[in-house]
Amino acid sequence: WAKRRFPIDTDRVFLSGYSMGGHGTWNIGLRFPDRFAGIAPCAGALTERDIASDPQAKALLGNARNLEPWFTHGENDETEPVANARKLDAALTDMGIHHVYEEIKGGAHLLPLFFGGGNVASLSSWAAPRKRNPAPEKIDYASIGDYADGAFWLRIAKRTGRGTIKLQGTVEKKQNVIRVSAEGPVSDLDVYLDDRLLDFKKKITIEVPGMDPVTVEKVELDNETILESWRSREDPKLVYGARVHVALKRKN
């Protein structure tokens, strides 16, 4: 709605919320990581379970790599245990994901504590220089449901069942090569070709483990792909002119 009515820079959209809004920020932001420049959950949690024993939540947390979260929590929060935030902080550190965690000393579950301390200035300093990279050379994406089809230029085209799907994609710009892999109940992928990453005047090769390479000798721009990619995101930075459908079959 807002993007249709206002001149919004889609590379500068942030998601934040407090308490239940903090829960929503974690869960929405990590499910749709290509929509935001960053997420800033406050006094919320991704899961009420221990992150180490919740494989779906841990898979989603990997989607934070391009979001580099900023989050805060009160030390004495009586509503949402601070232990959940501390475990997220530790998990992100273990995964090598850049983030900022600030704990309010003596703080409870009160919004005025957030506005009354130095958190707003810290949040502003974190957000000010941040911009989404709409054409990342590397994608690590996990989906735990059919609410979303992937991220950026790598999408799930066909699911074969329920369960967690993990996608990885890397563009080797000098070689004009895309390397993709998938785990979980998925049989087909769509790889969108992005001229910010690839030279459309040269042959493009898509490599998948255990399969023969897929070669695109000449990129043909396709109106259907342009329209479909616009409809799926309504984001001018995520519109693509061509795509390659990849059936994940083993070579003979």
Show the residue positions of the predicted features.
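Proline-centered loop/turn at the N-terminus of a beta-strand
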Residues: R12, G38, L67-W70
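The feature captures the conserved acid-bearing segment of alpha/beta-hydrolase catalytic domains
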Residues: A43-A128
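Alpha/beta-hydrolase-fold serine-hydrolase catalytic core, especially in secreted/extracellular enzymes
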Residues: D94-N252
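Gly/Ser-rich "nucleophile elbow"/oxyanion-hole loop immediately N-terminal to the catalytic nucleophile
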Residues: W1-M20, L30-F36
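Short loop/turn motifs at secondary-structure junctions
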Residues: P7-D9, R35, R65, P185, ...
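Hydrolases whose catalytic domains are alpha/beta-hydrolase-1, hotdog thioesterase
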Residues: G24-I28
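Sec-exported extracytoplasmic/periplasmic mature domains
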Residues: K3-P7, L30, A90-I97, A128-R132
